[in-house]
């Protein structure tokens, strides 16, 4: 116990010496020599009683050894007596200067408390008491004698920096904030005369009290800390201590506190780029300019940044500093290494779409995918109306204008505009020279082994969540099985019209079909009053009739020389074309269209005469029977009723002058045939041939024609076939 008390007194003496050394601040400032103004009491330990005068009036708690985030208090207690005006105003209170503490910045590590002592006449025998008894004796002595005669005067040797507040702590623990006018008068510090000194700016503060309780050397100490929350500022807390300030002889500068959780971001004014650092923004701004100050001394190529230049120089020297830890490959840049590991080893896809389940290895591919949701096509061709979602497809499209073919077959040296076309050429034309890798799960044959690995990973890897078919509710855990299942829906006409029997495979076709029922034509021409059901019809109409620069493509039929604006129309015409001299088909037969129409007419006539056919006997079996009487009644003015022809549909490529005109009426005759068994009379219409030059003589009967005249091409007409069937 005695040893602990002695150690406590020795520590208090050492801290008192440190406080006295700061007293020489003003003298060194004025150039004077340092002189000690007080003598430390000597500790005498003679083995018996050890008596020491302890000046243990604690006036201030200095937090010198606290965490660097706390500002330190800098005060100095000087010996002397209080002025008569101040003696009357001092009561049982203590004036303490406290600092601003931001408790939310980071955890606080409470260090040692340094005690600055002022001599008070209290004598305690150290050998027979403890620290607790020492504190009790001090309180009793203070209550008896008071502090009127020996009250120390607190003199701030430094101006209160920003974040400090002076409070008055009463005997019972009351805390009162002192305003500037209530403080004792102080002389102007000498350092304010320094031309380099700048007083700190004052800012509004909010007071918040919090208590810290900690244990130091077995003693519980309750410290009240006042947290003055300032407005949001930038910067970090500077580590300031009393020794550094005294040595530099300059007051501390106000610190800027950055609150936790608030991140400062910088945004580009020309695009939506954001970054957390100013240096990143400056580097990004160079991408909006054509400035390339860093030039390669080997090839003359220039770059925006030094990093890009270094990576380029590695391509000249062959240096690949970034090596893959999973394989033997090395890369020029760290970005290439990261991309390689994600594609080949980790298969990580950190960039995910917020609208669907798509995920990508590269952020550029994610941006391109998002444009498929928004429909944005920012990359426009300068020579035509083509627009693309990414620059790669635009470059590939520009080759159609320039005629460039950068991809060459290594076998036959044929050149292509796209790499995919070249690969397909090699697989189709040079299969004997290409190594084939068969997929063990399906019939796919792949030329390269790396492509086989990609195929296995994408098509046959197990999917935990499973993917649902877009056409039905089936769920599959393998992409290949899902694709094969969806192919079964390919020819299925899932969309059916509710007003007719029309069905189709795609929804857009059903939408266009329903417009035939509603009569809706939403696409109107801006140059005339015509409207259309489809946009492509509107575009075609505009090009043909309103575009002065439009030159229609001419597709010429090789048989008759007709021209068409569409290839499929010309191909359909060529199948039925017989050449410029006739209307027969390619082999001299009838055209497909005429055959189809003739079959339809024959079918309708068969249905009309089905009843009479069932009632007629087989005339071929009754060879011995006599033929029925035949009467010919020529019609003076035959006017057969012919159905009105349907409106001619205007087709592209057909000359406007040619329309479907009905054939001229030929003289006909009606033959009445009476059946002897049933008595039924049937009328048969036959054509009568008349010679234009020779007229029949009087009294001479015209010979009935039991069958119609032959067709111009030598084939039987429907009337001839019906008459033969009746006989």
Swiss-Prot record:
Stretches with biased composition (Basic residues)? 202-211, 593-604
Q: Where is this cross-link: Glycyl lysine isopeptide (Lys-Gly) (interchain with G-Cter in SUMO)?
A: 74
Report the GO terms under cellular component. Answer: chromosome, centromeric region; condensed chromosome; male germ cell nucleus; nucleolus; nucleoplasm; nucleus
Q: Which residue stretches are annotated zinc finger (C2H2-type)?
A: 266-288, 294-316, 322-345, 351-373, 379-401, 407-430, 437-460, 467-489, 495-517, 523-546, 555-577
List compositional bias (Polar residues) regions by residue number: 658-677
Q: Which GO terms describe its biological process?
A: cardiac muscle cell development; chromatin looping; chromosome segregation; DNA methylation-dependent constitutive heterochromatin formation; epigenetic regulation of gene expression; gene expression; genomic imprinting; in utero embryonic development
Q: Which UniProt keywords apply?
A: Acetylation, Activator, Centromere, Chromatin regulator, Chromosome, Chromosome partition, Disease variant, DNA-binding, Intellectual disability, Isopeptide bond, Metal-binding, Nucleus, Phosphoprotein, Repeat, Repressor, Transcription, Transcription regulation, Tumor suppressor, Ubl conjugation, Zinc, Zinc-finger
Coarse class of the primary localization is nucleus
- Extract the ranges annotated as region (Disordered): 180-211, 573-677, 689-717
InterPro entries from the xrefs? Zinc_finger, Znf-C2H2_CTCF, Znf_C2H2_sf, Znf_C2H2_type
Q: Which post-translational modifications are recorded for this protein?
A: Sumoylated on Lys-74 and Lys-689; sumoylation of CTCF contributes to the repressive function of CTCF on the MYC P2 promoter.
Q: Where is the composition biased (Acidic residues)?
A: 610-636, 694-704
Annotated positions of the N-acetylmethionine modification? 1
Compositional bias of type Pro residues: which residue ranges? 637-647
Q: What does this protein do?
A: Chromatin binding factor that binds to DNA sequence specific sites and regulates the 3D structure of chromatin. Binds together strands of DNA, thus forming chromatin loops, and anchors DNA to cellular structures, such as the nuclear lamina. Defines the boundaries between active and heterochromatic DNA via binding to chromatin insulators, thereby preventing interaction between promoter and nearby enhancers and silencers. Plays a critical role in the epigenetic regulation. Participates in the allele-specific gene expression at the imprinted IGF2/H19 gene locus.
Q: Which disease is it linked to?
A: Intellectual developmental disorder, autosomal dominant 21: A disorder characterized by significantly below average general intellectual functioning associated with impairments in adaptive behavior and manifested during the developmental period. Additional MRD21 features include short stature, microcephaly, and developmental delay.
- Remaining remarks: More than 13'00 CTCF-binding sites in potential insulators were identified in the human genome.
Oligomeric form and interacting partners: Interacts with CHD8. Interacts with LLPH. Interacts with CENPE. Interacts with BRD2; promoting BRD2 recruitment to chromatin.
| Family designation | Belongs to the CTCF zinc-finger protein family.
Q: What is this protein called?
A: Transcriptional repressor CTCF
The record lists the organism as Homo sapiens
